């Protein structure tokens, strides 16, 4: 980790650029033994707990159109990591990820 950083202990978040199919990448990784998990937050105001607040337009404030937040929500996923990962495992994950986006 970089100095003064606090990386996640359980996963590495990946956000696909425009033109990269997240579902294809996730399926490719999973089929090659690299486990993934979907992002579990994203644009919070689209979560069910905001249903009533959206109807009344009360209880929260939105600044801007949140297009970046929507992009992250729709195009991000986690790959699992843990402190005991070997360089060989990390290299394998990187190789599979590169292959997935080049396909």
Regions found by a protein language model. Name each.
Residues 1-103:
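PLP-dependent aminotransferase class I/II
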């Amino acid at each position: 980790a970089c100095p003064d950083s606090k990386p996640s202990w359980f996963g590495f978040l990946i956000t696909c650029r425009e033109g990269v199919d997240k579902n294809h990448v996730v399926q490719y990784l999973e089929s090659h033994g690299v486990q993934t998990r979907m992002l579990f937050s994203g644009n919070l105001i689209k979560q069910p707990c905001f249903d009533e607040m959206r109807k009344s337009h009360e209880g929260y404030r939105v600044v801007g159109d949140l297009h970046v937040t929507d992009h992250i929500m729709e195009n991000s996923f986690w790959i699992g990591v843990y402190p005991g990962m070997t360089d060989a495992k990390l290299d394998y994950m990187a190789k599979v990820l590169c292959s997935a986006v080049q396909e």
